[in-house]
Amino acid sequence: MSETETRPTNFIRQIIDEDLKSGKHSSVHTRFPPEPNGYLHIGHAKSICLNFGIAQDYQGQCNLRFDDTNPEKEDIEYVESIKNDVKWLGFDWSGDIHYSSNYFDKLYDYAVELIEKGLAYVDELTSDQIREYRGSLKEPGKNSPYRDRSVEENLALFEQMRDGKFKEGTICLRAKIDMASSFIVMRDPVIYRIRFATHHQTGDKWCIYPMYDFTHCISDALEGITHSICTLEFQDNRRLYDWVLENITIDCQPHQYEFSRLNLEYTIMSKRKLNELVTEKLVNGWDDPRMPTVSGLRRRGFTAGSIREFCKRIGVTKQENMIEFGSLESCIRDDLNENAPRAMAVLEPVKVVIENYEEGKVETLNVANHPNKPEMGTREVPFTREIYIEQDDFREEANKKYKRLVLGKEVRLRGAYVIQANRIEKDEAGNITTIFCSYDTETLGKNPADGRKVKGVIHWVSADKAFPAEIRLYDRLFTVPNSAALEDFSESINPESLITKQGFVEPSLVTAEAEAGYQFERTGYFCIDNKDSTPEALVFNRTVGLRDTWEG
């Protein structure tokens, strides 16, 4: 995190302040515990900024722990991606990376302890039967017929589960709590199930795996976590979190705190639905710039600083709300307006021939990289007899409000001369193919000598020296603010979320590094694509427009 970024405040930090003041804790230890079954998204970034930010501000520690208890859905690819995302966002974890699988031996021992205390039993109900016996919010659950097995029988069966003597789905270990509890999570939850799957960390050592609610709290305690922070959907699970720790022999007793998850307009956060977008090829992979994944946002041109600023602006509360997508765009727009160098690119070109400019002549102009930051220097831009301008920057006729090039009138070329349109050529379909102009030789960097006013300024590139580029215009992935609420969210995909143009860019951009951000003058903010772009075939992604023009 940048030293210039201000320290936020929220209810969790207020709790921490009180805990330190009262002596409840002498230091702060948080953790970020993703499951490695997908790519991190902007919602995870909020949690990363919260947990790692707290550790930084309180000179504490934050662990990166992979909650890897579901081997069938997890992959080392996701582990590496998550590590890269955390570091790219500007954070680093304390000490070694932690894995819940590091604790499988201890978790097994704690499960045995619960059995020995008569607080866990091996159940042979099917998953459907367990669901049926659990009841509902209006009806209490009912006890499994296997609930009152002896401790000795449960220990023997659990050992046989570990030794692979049972098939998947035929038997499990459940906590013995209260089937009449008003909280369904406390109605004898499953804490171990059988999975014959190779684990990316432990291989084939285990064929039984602990459930999240059993693993999570014990992992926190073993790591000495002082403040276990998660989103509101785990609020009821706090009762199970506390129950497990209160009923095993363990020194540390962390406390769980909940905050509202991020809900962002015009996108979705569900891993299942994001995976559907990828598998159904509705997007081009997890790092598609339209995706809310950290890798997708990064590829689109969002900076780590802009994401951190967004997370700071939206704050941390217990109130569920929908954040405007424009808030995220505002953060990157502010960042790039301040820090991105300027460049010129023409997305829909039409040729301009300056008839009174010498053929073959190449003039090297020095153009400022940033209008308000002279320390960012200048770049060399070649000026030639033939240039490209945007088709939309010329009209044969126009009213006074149109401040661009009009037949018979003048306009200034950015960083160059004043030109006047004198005549045009069209093809058989009536499309303008060439605009013939003349230029005022005395207007480089100064106003016309006779005092006439030239109000408009347009961008351009040299037709001879510019480089062709594929320019991808990305927009919001969905046409409705809350697509997640729809029965079929895919029906609301924005057909114009990606529009590709074949344009031209000034030659200085050929050497730009991947992910480098620029303001294309008068067009928007763009970056070099970090996957497809090469010096021989440039690809630029639109990060955000110069202003918010979305109408929904």
Curated annotation (Swiss-Prot):
Any single GO BP term: glutaminyl-tRNA aminoacylation
Keyword ATP-binding recorded: yes
One Gene Ontology molecular-function label: glutamine-tRNA ligase activity
Subcellular location: Cytoplasm
GO cellular component annotations of the record: cytosol
Chief localization: cytoplasm
Cross-referenced InterPro entries: aa-tRNA-synth_I_CS, Gln-tRNA-synth, Gln/Glu-tRNA_Ligase, Gln_tRNA_ligase_bac, Glu/Gln-tRNA-synth, Glu/Gln-tRNA-synth_Ib_cat-dom, Glu/Gln-tRNA-synth_Ib_codon-bd, Rbsml_bL25/Gln-tRNA_synth_N
Binding-site list for L-glutamine: D67, Y212
Annotated motif 'KMSKS' region, positions: 268-272
Residues engaged in binding ATP: 35-37, 41-47, 231, 261-262, 269-271
Top EC class of this enzyme: ligase
Keyword Glycosyltransferase: no
Quaternary assembly: Monomer.
Name this protein carries in UniProt: Glutamine--tRNA ligase
